[in-house]
Amino acid sequence: MFIGVCRLAIQIPDARSLKDRRRVVKSFKDRVRAKLPVSIAEVGDLEHPGIAYLGLAVVANETSRCSEILSAVVSMARVVPDGILADVRTEIVSFGSGGKGIEHGIEASLSDDAHGDFDEDER
């Protein structure tokens, strides 16, 4: 399993208010969600009308598929009406089956007796 993450910075030079910025961001997020299997959210500097930071995540069974989807998002971001793509950061990581993730896998974490002393009567 591979997880692709991307952080976009989109400048919105004509935004005079947060409402102007939200209009541009919502339109972009809706278009991305309609066309691509990604999760997308604003991730920083929510109070500045002139720039929006968006985080995206995708899960796929091949790195090439993650890369293809993230590239499609970046292509869409390059043509955002009223926006200018200012920065892009992407990373694809392997998880499970030889990849790095939770040490010894989530199964080991779940089988640990971390909650062994929990007594339901103590609620």
Name each region found by the language model.
Residues F2-R123:
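Long, contiguous binding/interaction regions
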